[in-house]
């Protein structure tokens, strides 16, 4: 039988590898509504096709509903500017809904253990653990963690109970494993859309910069001509000087606009 990587008595966190934890397979299996599962997957496919930004939220909602969980979520692994690794909850539902966007450390965490082993985990965390990491949330009495990865991006999808100690079974694992694949696809799609948006914005900025360059050329040429004429002296020199000031103001405004554009992109 597998042993916990961290005992709940000392740390408040208990994580068990499902591939070696035989007791999980002996848990009582709840009856399932196959039609409900099919309808949920159809709804998921529909959201992905018609409203992609909502796919991650739909994923956790379906995970929670099909597994009978109290909370569900998707964690994304991130790197901080200092090179540290952390997890951001990019989708949450149930009792953990208020913690959308929460950032947790990767060291000494169920998600970190899950990704380090690249294997599904059963986990529990007590109030002691949550207090240690500074999170004011209900403890986890039973939880399933499934890793997912696409290219270099990875994370976990999870369902948790806050009261029952043996809520999840092999069928829940099967369902969550399938949904983990959807999570990976959804995250990759989101990244591709963001990249496309950035590229579109960059192209728009380039076009605007080219337009500004042409607009700058006119007052610049006028300024050069006016300065030349003013330098010749004569009765019109004062008028040419005033015109040079006006051209300089126009040129300065366009340059500021161009500089602002560069800062924005």
What are these regions (language model features)?
Residues 2-54, 205:
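Signal-transmission linkers at sensory-effector interfaces
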Residues 40, 192-215:
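Conserved HAMP-HisKA connector
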Residues 66, 238-265:
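Conserved DHp (HisKA) dimerization/phosphotransfer helix of two-component histidine kinases, i.e.
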Residues 85, 95-123, 128-129:
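Acidic/proline- and glycine-rich, intrinsically disordered low-complexity segments
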Residues 95, 155-167:
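Short beta-strand-to-loop transition segments that serve as allosteric relay/switch motifs
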Residues 141-150:
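A short, aliphatic-rich beta-strand micro-motif
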Residues 177-184:
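Allosteric cytosolic regulatory segments
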